[in-house]
């Protein structure tokens, strides 16, 4: 069993005809994911990698293929509209891989999604993978993962890969690995993922990786105190980061005492 996506998930790629979209659609399909559709306005009727059909709109793709999860690979200026289009078409789960979306756009998106049933993962995230279910909905390297019973949730994509690589190297497999993204405004939170892992009978423990910026780690700590009953290992990175300097992610910046690594570790 996995959380968020499983072997029955029907994946759609918005921006599938672009270089990154087509490349990762192929890798996801090769891993075992059920990639059923792509969307690029003006290119409907074509086929792309693995003979996946391309549609002009998300609505057309959903109607024709039953796609129920979308990965967004469109350029940052158009990513917010792509998220809203997928939500309007009734897609229940969206993982926005795109990086560099204007904060003003995400303010509108987050507000818009509050009144919907859509789950947004990201933006600026690697997506998710379940080695148990052989489903990859994102950009993480599939070969480093091993089926098992440890969940992983992280703000950082590359640190997720590092943690997973070490777990696999020690013979410890993973149930589901979720990258929630490093932007200041995002959808699914640490708490959301921890709640799902808590309810998942096939996850025995969790590795959580946080970083400087914001207060999501502190919020998760408060949740864990009262509601999380499984073993949890937490890594907070950025202890040497200088205040006011962005460290990779748009949200990885110390703007106050609570955003510092040492405060999160407390």
Question: How would you label these PLM feature ranges?
Answer:
Residues 1-266:
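Catalytic-core regions of core metabolic enzymes
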